[in-house]
Regions:
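An N-terminal-biased, well-structured beta-alpha scaffold segment characteristic
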Residues: 1-87, 209
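Residues at the starts of beta-strands that form the adenosine-phosphate
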Residues: 3, 26, 137, 159-160
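Redox-cofactor binding/interface segments in oxidoreductases and associated redox assembly factors
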Residues: 6, 47-48, 66, 195-196, ...
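Short, conserved loop/helix-junction motifs that constitute active-site signature segments
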Residues: 54-60, 77-82, 213-217, 239-243, ...
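Phosphate-binding beta-alpha-beta segment of Rossmann-like dinucleotide-binding domains, i.e.
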Residues: 82-137, 163
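Rossmann-like adenosine-cofactor binding region
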Residues: 168-263
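Rossmann-like dinucleotide-binding domain for NAD(H)/NADP(H)
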Residues: 219, 225-320
Length: 320
């Protein structure tokens, strides 16, 4: 029998599914906020999120099914116990986060935020022309699961989509062109909407700097749902204050949480949310995380290949 420790929030319906996978699995549940080293010593499988420094206490770990898509903190040498398989939840978050992104863009494009300000004043006032997604050019930087799902939705609304990713793969039919990061600044020049879904690795640190913002149109909308560290916050503030870009939608920031006295809060052309585009805010995403875990638990029991195995050199999944 294998001991499975679930260290993530789950619904009762999720527990029913997990508890009935196989009599070979002894499944227990504990919050990752209170888990102790002694809880981990004889654990064979972990499902959820565990602070990287706690993994050293997992003396017989065979499978770590992370509930996140991002793997920051876990790929350094020695973090994952030797012999353990490490898989992430890539593929779970695209639906929820892409809808958030489209919603944020429409909010600023259609001036919903400004009309909401007028509402308490009972002010019936036409705020003039607005922009449209139809006919726009969208650049998606970080064209993985989340970026692709967002691109599909933007294409459906009539935007021409360009993608940038770490390594070139087969281009989806709906995408105008696919590039690597080497072409970032050139691609920025034509975009009306720039969306970044980049993870927080050293190679993505402050990719969006002064030079990047200077390459953008002054009418561009910038949206970040990846990691705040991919953006030079000072450069972003300068671009917004000088109207070098039209607006920003930020679900992630650097630093995070964003300090209460940070000037981004008071900028009228910025929409800020506290890292809520993913997580368990949309049940369908929560369900998808559990579905990935269930499939991999079954694969483990049958000796089959695990889905979403993380390449420890890149931090990305090697398979689907």
């Amino acid at each position: 029998m294998y001991k499975v420790l679930v260290v993530m929030d789950v619904l009762e319906e999720h527990k029913v599914i997990l508890d009935n996978i196989s009599p070979e699995l002894n499944v227990s549940y504990i919050s990752n906020k209170v888990v102790k080293p002694e809880d981990l010593a004889d654990t064979d499988i972990i499902v959820g999120y565990l602070a990287p420094d706690l993994l050293k206490h997992c003396k017989q770990l065979k499978l770590f099914q992370l509930s996140n898509a991002g793997t920051e903190g876990f790929t350094a040498e020695g973090v994952i116990p030797e012999g353990a398989v490490f898989a992430n939840a890539s593929g779970a978050y695209g639906l929820a986060m892409s809808e958030y992104m489209v919603g944020g863009i429409l909010c600023l494009m259609k001036k919903f935020d400004q009309y909401k300000v007028n509402q308490p004043k009972h002010e019936w006032k036409d705020l003039g022309p607005v922009n449209a997604i139809y006919g726009s050019k969208t650049l998606v930087v970080g064209f993985g699961d989340i970026g692709n799902e967002f691109g599909v939705r933007m294409n459906a609304l009539g935007s021409k989509v360009t993608g940038i990713r770490k390594h070139l793969t087969n281009k989806p039919d709906y995408v105008e062109s696919l590039h690597t990061m080497d072409d970032l600044h050139e691609c920025l020049k034509d975009a009306d909407i720039v969306a970044t879904c980049l993870p927080g690795y050293s190679e993505t640190l402050k990719v969006f700097n002064k030079e990047a913002f200077d390459s953008m149109k002054d009418s561009v909308l910038f949206i970040n749902v990846g990691r705040g560290t991919a953006v030079d916050t000072d450069a972003l503030c300068d671009a917004l204050e000088s109207s070098k870009i039209a607006g920003a939608i930020l679900d992630v920031t650097d630093p995070e949480p964003l300090p209460a006295d940070h000037k981004l809060w008071d900028m009228p052309n910025v929409l800020i949310t506290p890292h809520v585009s993913g997580g368990y805010h949309v049940k369908a995403a929560h369900d998808r995380i559990i579905e990935i875990a269930v499939r991999n638990l079954n694969h483990f029991l049958k000796g089959e290949a695990i889905e979403n195995i993380v390449n420890m050199s890149t931090g990305y999944r090697d398979n689907k």
